[in-house]
Amino acid sequence: MGHTPFGHIGEKALSHAISLYRGMDPDDPKNEYIFAHNQQSARIVEYLEKDGRGLNLSHEVIDGIRCHSGNLRAETAEGRIVAISDRIAYVTHDIDDAKRAGLLSEEYLPTEAREVLGNSSPERIENMVHDIVSESSRVGDIKMTDSMWRAMMTMRAFLFANLYASGDAKYEEPKAYDLIIELFDYFVNHLDEVPTEYKCHDFDHPEIQVADFVSGMTDRYATRIFEDLRLPRSWGKRRYVK
């Protein structure tokens, strides 16, 4: 929920497109995350669901959604649990996904991190959870020990250097970026083709209506719409449905 097609590269593309539409410098660092998936997730549950009525979630739940990633510190203990759980989840699950895909094996993971975290995903999750429970009880806040946090961040840095920033996914990023820009530019100039449910809010901000629409697409759906809009077809109607 809230995540753009193609992950964080789609998020960056929408931030760039919105900045340009508003006459702002897209290369200014403060405009890099005009569109942020965690804020979009909160927007969905507060304003977009149920025809604009929202889901009537508690402050703690929305706090966890809004602050689950990035540098925002959650106001509530529940929100801080979500944030630290998110980091545990993507580090451990991305390792599992990479191993299943044959992109890395356990022995290539940083030794110093494995010595603290453990040598398998179940072991790593168990050790981190126990560490959080113990340290949180000790300090009266939701927290890992410094040694466990450093080990987790070492593993995260390894994944960024050897998985996220290399390989097929990285090669495809420029194409995904351009695709999102193209979709935004098309629909912001053809608002009549944006589905009605996305036009019930922000009447004076068509860029937000379009961002709501595009960010809710799956990778496959975004690609299919792009093909319909930009690639020639022999006779026939567009495949996508408004």
Residue ranges, per PLM feature:
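Aspartate-rich (DDxxD/NDxxD/DxxxD) Mg2+/diphosphate-binding motifs
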Residues: 1-31, 38
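Histidine-centered, transition-metal-coordinating active-site segments
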Residues: 22, 34-242
